[in-house]
Amino acid sequence: MANVLMIGFPGEGHINPSIGVMKELKSRGENITYYAVKEYKEKITALDIEFREYHDFRGDYFGKNATGDEERDFTEMLCAFLKACKDIATHIYEEVKHESYDYVIYDHHLLAGKVIANMLKLPRFSLCTTFAMNEEFAKEMMGAYMKGSLEDSPHYESYQQLAETLNADFQAEIKKPFDVFLADGDLTIVFTSRGFQPLAEQFGERYVFVGPSITERAGNNDFPFDQIDNENVLFISMGTIFNNQKQFFNQCLEVCKDFDGKVVLSIGKHIKTSELNDIPENFIVRPYVPQLEILKRASLFVTHGGMNSTSEGLYFETPLVVIPMGGDQFVVADQVEKVGAGKVIKKEELSESLLKETIQEVMNNRSYAEKAKEIGQSLKAAGGSKKAADSILEAVKQKTQSANA
């Protein structure tokens, strides 16, 4: 039995994929301590593993806006993220420096995890919940945030100072700005398949593609499945971050009021059902729904294009209409369209007529469903949590044997 330190990134799309891997490692006898924000305590302790809390930095990093419309200086965001990583790493290191661990697992986008592994001089494994990124790919994604160059920002000097401090005092290994968001490991576990990964040939053996980590989730037992079990189901969700979308949700109510089947609309926690326009009889509107169970039944998924939601939709062979709002969603959306598993609507072009036209096109053209099925089969064949655990444990074994040789 090995002692494992896990450091997760706050967000459903980051925590959920890690759950299956933690569950699998625990079943192999590993003893896991999992650091995350308080919001995920119940989800983690349900696995019968130790939960420890670190400060939730998302208000500083993402801001208060959940529409995807807020423009922020990218260098300012870098600074906020580096400050958060410094604080998290300091907090965790003080708690674990006198404890005994055998290896560290962390979210690929949480630099603090890599820092802790380096400071403890332990093998490190990152869980990548987006596409695997190289420098070219990372620059493309960063371009979605950036207005002008980093050097033009009034926050650039602060960024340089923070990066230098983290390199000198925390072994952060920041050489270029994209290193702040891409904390690679001795192995990087990527939750997609090589069949869906852009530029897959550029990623070698240190990248293990396992497909999405699909695990049953607790809660929402009151969802009226009897209303959708024998229906044509259209599922609409904008995820958990960019879901303050009252105007969009009202557009959906209007566009889909004559849909021949049931429309399941997940609106998140920012908007109350009472704030929306009149809800048609063919709609089920909830703050949160059991997404996996809905996707098993859905004919079409209208999504923001978060990697986790997209992967889950395709895993269940559901064609997509993608309306990206921010971050890596633009890259994910482009790949969905490139492989033919769905269509993209740019948020600045969104209208009721375009939404209706796009939904009808994807529903009525069987090629989208066929491509979604093809990608879904590649995701299922990638190996999932079992392959992730196998790869981590084999790497740990090899490192141990090498150290003892």
From Swiss-Prot:
Keywords: Glycosyltransferase, Transferase. Transmembrane segments: none annotated. The keyword Glycosyltransferase applies. GO terms for molecular function: hexosyltransferase activity; UDP-glycosyltransferase activity. Its EC number is 2.4.1.-. It holds the Pfam family EryCIII-like_C. Gene3D superfamilies: Glycogen Phosphorylase B. It comes from the Bacteria. It is an enzyme of class 2 (transferase). PANTHER family: EG:EG0003.4 PROTEIN-RELATED, FI06409P-RELATED. Belongs to the UDP-glycosyltransferase family. This is Uncharacterized UDP-glucosyltransferase YojK. It comes from Bacillus subtilis (strain 168). The gene is yojK.
